[in-house]
Amino acid sequence: MFAAGLAPFYASNFSLWSAAYCSSAGPGGCSFALDPAAVKKPSFCIADILHAGVGEPGPAAEGLVGASAALTAHLGSVHPHASFQAAARSPLRPTPVVAPSEVPAGFPQRLSPLSAAFHQHLPQQSPTQQQQPQQQPPPPPRAVSLQPPTSGTRVVPHHSGSAPAPSSKDLKFGIDRILSAEFDPKVKEGNTLRDLTSLLTGGRPAGVHLAGLQPSAGQFFASLDPISEASAILSPLSSNPRNSVQHQFQDTFPGPYAVLTKDTMPQTYKRKRSWSRAVFSNLQRKGLEKRFEIQKYVTKPDRKQLAAMLGLTDAQVKVWFQNRRMKWRHSKEAQAQKDKDKEAGEKPSGGVPAEGEREERSPSRSEGEAESESSDSESLDMAPSDTERTEGTERSLHQTTVIKASAAGALITASSSTSGSSFSFSSTSSLGSGNTHVGSASSLGGNCSELPSAHQPSVTSSPQSPEIAQAPLAGL
């Protein structure tokens, strides 16, 4: 085996054999004649091992000894379906096994999923594509990224004849379609329903074959009533109102499908109020009003009791009292403002006294001031006894002057001077000894002093005053 050239396959270190077996002039009969292109620094990378010497017939193929032919026969017996070319391949450069173009009759039919898919799609290729691997060397194997298989589907690798990937316009929710006019809020309802129908019935992604679904998965999807057929969703559209359709879409298509509901159908979208306006009966309203007159703020136990009595909920009673307090507060403020305006209107008319009353009050006030001034002056000049005497004589003088004014025989003389004024009167009578009574009064500088006679008659004090009045008439 060592002389036949099989030793390098089992050596632990290839660098020991590279100089002897990879050079053009090796030791004795153990050297392999290689082409000039292969005479370079030996490399055992995966790419060099797979690609070196492929399709390049060595010019010194005959240089191989019989042991190399035996090696080729041995490899052919191990892999009967692989075509090995001894002249083109070196024992140091093993060639990967290529899948045969025709399956022999003795090949077992138990295939893996990938190989079965390969044989299933192989007849669809054109004859030129089938002859192409024979004319050209096979391309290097590429790393295939296999997606994890979903439940009920088989992963089918895309071959060279598969359809290209769909563009963004063909996708149901691609960027171009979302930005197009179909997702405009002013779009009609018919367009939305058409898109919904096409979404449910067709538009499956390329490369996914529903024929590969397992029976269990198919039965599972068929058991889902809301999304089994398009009619299950489109049937309520003619009978239910638009609001119910809106909520049905939201429940049926959560996530990215929600763009079909709120944004594309603004005419049908209408916000439903979370609460409705409560309508109270007359009995309930009277009960609430009566309780409000007694108690403006109701405690929680009282509120619950009142709600149970009137057949209302606790929240309804609470809201009613809040609104009623607000109304009562506004009415109270309006009444206070009205009273304030009314008082402001009455103040100019009732507060200022009239002109007639002002003129009537002024004379009386002046008279009172004059009396007070005269009394003050008299009290300063005279003693208290004189003041009393003067008051008594004033009353008697006033009475006698009235009597003398009516008498015909009375003589009244008056004279005035620069310093003051004085007047005197005299009368004669035949009573007694015929005494003449003379009275005089003078005022100087505002001071008044009166010196009446001791025998001056008065109406009240002397009963002979009528005779005094008649005496001048008899004498004349």
Curated annotation (Swiss-Prot):
GO terms for molecular function: DNA-binding transcription factor activity, RNA polymerase II-specific; sequence-specific DNA binding. Its main location: nucleus. Residues 435-446, 455-467 have a biased composition (Polar residues). One of its GO terms (biological process) is cell population proliferation. Residues 331-346, 355-368, 386-397 have a biased composition (Basic and acidic residues). GO terms for cellular component: nucleus. Disulfide bonds: none annotated. Induction: By TBX21 in developing as well as mature Th1 cells. Keywords: Differentiation, DNA-binding, Homeobox, Nucleus, Transcription, Transcription regulation. Residues 123-134, 158-168, 413-434 have a biased composition (Low complexity). It is found in: Nucleus. InterPro entries: H2.0_Homeobox_TF (IPR052497), HD (IPR001356), HD_metazoa (IPR020479), Homeobox_CS (IPR017970), Homeodomain-like_sf (IPR009057), HTH_motif (IPR000047). The keyword DNA-binding applies. It holds the Pfam family Homeodomain. Residues 120-169, 328-401, 413-476 are annotated as: Disordered. Residues 369-379 have a biased composition (Acidic residues). Disruption phenotype: Th1 cells lacking Hlx or Tbx21 fail to express normal levels of the Th1-specific cytokine Ifng. Expressed in Th1 cells, CD8-positive T-cells, B-cells and NK cells. CDD domains: homeodomain. Residues 273-332 bind DNA. Signal peptide: none annotated. Belongs to the H2.0 homeobox family. Transcription factor required for TBX21/T-bet-dependent maturation of Th1 cells as well as maintenance of Th1-specific gene expression. Involved in embryogenesis and hematopoiesis. This is H2.0-like homeobox protein. It comes from Mus musculus.
